[in-house]
């Protein structure tokens, strides 16, 4: 074989080696469960914000609805049930598979219920229905995250997290776009009922692939003490690690600014006079593709730079991206401006979605996957959601959108500094769980 032929063959192998991990069954499973994970969030997030704003509900009331997201932040309280309680009859399908089916049906029922409410006639029942969707979506997320982490091998966490984020964004974007288009042509009830079908990809994936290979069957426990240990065990194990409290502090503060900015975004766009079609094209459409590109770049950064450096880069980009909303608010209605702003923000979020989720997944102990990841993911946005639901609306009304988004940029700085410091003193590696190759796990995961 000539030198040129060898070079071409080598380049082809290199290209295939780069693409191949995305087509492994574990990565594809992460993608499809991610689709179903994303859509309930959209149903009580930007989509519901738009629906309420168009119904003339006040800003303070609309932002108060984001408290429904706090249910996601409390999911660690019942995540132990998903880890340790075996369902009767259907449980023969496997612990994760059976819970995936039950949680999926719960989500579909809750979304259909929210479809039937009239916010103008009964705002209290609308709020209750949104909370029910939050509870169902949070339970679905517990199962989905555990299924993803236990399906992926340690070396697949980067690619798998990327595929999960691809799926999450497609699910949330599809739900948002479908809801906007159908609501503009029919009504919000039809829009929400159509979106309920997005629970099916995760349910079908679990049925087809079956139980994750790394899942450890629940241990039969009897008595009060044994039951208490089943609940407390995952938390005790996590906090016994070196630097666990600092890791938790980072999880709590790293995303405050990003959470605040995103949950108020649709209010900004509504006040700037953007139509549903403009939002669908320039916000949802451009943002969608920018996010996908960001996910790809995030996967490259993770594989080339390792976990610590790639996470630090992502944190800086996500913090700076919020400042672009202050620029948009200052210059006023502009479709190109909205496209550029959403492009930058979603590109940054795509990178962060891969590397930060990979880091959080690696923190889990495989004995307590559902409970520990529920704790980590819930803590990641609880502060931002609490501030949004209690004071964000008043902050916008008192200080204006420009100053509000400058504030969200500034409060991203502590999380960046904390992660940099933990990397310098070795706490990132010391706190790693078995899912990421720590302790008795596979040490090949890039840190």
Where are these regions (language model features)?
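C-terminal ends and interior cores of transmembrane alpha-helices
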Residues: 99-120, 316-333
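Glycine-rich segments within core transmembrane alpha-helices of 12-TM secondary carriers
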Residues: 72-75, 158-177, 183, 377-388
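Helix-to-loop junctions at the C-terminal end of transmembrane segments
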Residues: 75-92, 293-310, 396-397
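Symmetry-related core transmembrane helices of the 12-TM Major Facilitator Superfamily/SLC fold
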Residues: 102-108, 190-208, 403-421
């Amino acid at each position: 074989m000539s030198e040129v032929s060898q070079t071409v063959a080598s380049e082809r192998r290199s290209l295939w080696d780069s693409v191949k991990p995305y087509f492994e069954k574990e990565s594809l499973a992460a993608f499809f469960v991610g689709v179903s994970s994303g859509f309930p969030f959209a149903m009580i997030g930007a989509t519901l914000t738009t629906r309420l704003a168009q119904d003339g509900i006040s800003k303070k009331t609309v932002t108060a609805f984001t408290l429904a997201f706090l249910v996601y932040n409390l999911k660690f309280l019942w995540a132990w049930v998903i880890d340790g309680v075996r369902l009767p009859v259907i449980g023969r399908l496997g612990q994760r598979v059976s819970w995936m089916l039950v949680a999926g049906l719960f989500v579909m029922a809750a979304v259909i219920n929210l479809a039937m409410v009239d916010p103008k006639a009964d705002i209290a029942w609308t709020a209750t229905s949104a909370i029910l969707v939050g509870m169902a979506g949070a339970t679905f997320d517990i199962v989905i995250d555990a299924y993803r982490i236990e399906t992926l091998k340690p070396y697949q966490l980067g690619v798998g997290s990327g595929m999960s984020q691809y799926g999450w964004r497609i699910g949330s974007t599809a739900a948002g776009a479908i809801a906007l288009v159908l609501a503009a042509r029919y009504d919000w009830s039809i829009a929400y009922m159509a979106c309920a079908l997005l629970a099916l990809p995760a349910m079908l994936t679990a049925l087809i692939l079956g139980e994750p290979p790394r899942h450890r069957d629940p241990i039969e426990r009897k008595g009060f003490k044994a039951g208490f240990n089943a609940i407390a065990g995952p938390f005790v194990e996590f906090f016994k690690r070196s630097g666990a409290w600092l890791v938790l502090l980072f999880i709590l503060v790293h995303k405050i600014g990003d959470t605040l900015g995103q949950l108020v975004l649709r209010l900004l766009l509504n006040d700037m006079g953007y139509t549903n079609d403009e939002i669908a094209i320039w916000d949802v459409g451009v943002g969608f593709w920018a996010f996908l590109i960001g996910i790809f770049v995030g996967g490259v950064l993770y594989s080339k730079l390792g976990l610590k450096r790639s996470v630090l880069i992502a944190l800086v980009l996500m913090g700076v991206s919020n400042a672009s909303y202050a620029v948009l608010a200052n210059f006023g209605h502009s479709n190109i401006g909205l496209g550029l702003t959403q492009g930058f923000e979603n590109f940054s979020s795509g990178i962060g979605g891969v590397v930060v989720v990979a880091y959080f997944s690696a923190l889990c102990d495989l004995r307590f996957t559902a409970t520990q990841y529920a704790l980590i993911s819930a803590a990641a946005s609880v502060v931002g959601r609490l501030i949004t639901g209690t004071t964000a609306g008043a902050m916008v009304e008192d200080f204006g959108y420009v100053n509000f988004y400058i504030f969200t940029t500034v409060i991203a700085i502590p999380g960046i500094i904390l992660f940099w410091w933990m990397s310098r003193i070795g706490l990132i590696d010391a706190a790693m769980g078995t899912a990421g190759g720590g302790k008795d796990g596979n040490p090949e995961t890039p840190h």
